[in-house]
Amino acid sequence: MKYQVTFFDKETKYKPVACIIEAESRTEIAKGKWKDAMKKVCIKRGWKPSEMVKMGYTTWKCRRAE
C-alpha cells in the first residue's frame, strides 16, 4: 500500500514537505519506515537529515495515498 508521509514544523506547520512510500501498514511506518521517507525527502531536496531537523522538520504524519 502507498502512504504519503508529511514532515512539518510542529509549532508553525510552515512549509510541509512530503513523499510517498510503500509500506504494509501505518504501524510499519511508525516503527521506523518514516526514516526511509525522511531520507527520500532529503535526497529530493539536497539536504542532510541533520539539516532537515535543524530547519524544524521534527514532526511527521501519515495518510494513505490514492
Roles of regions detected by a PLM:
Residues K2-E28, T59:
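N-terminal acidic leader/helix
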Residues K35-E66:
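Short, mixed-charge low-complexity intrinsically disordered segments
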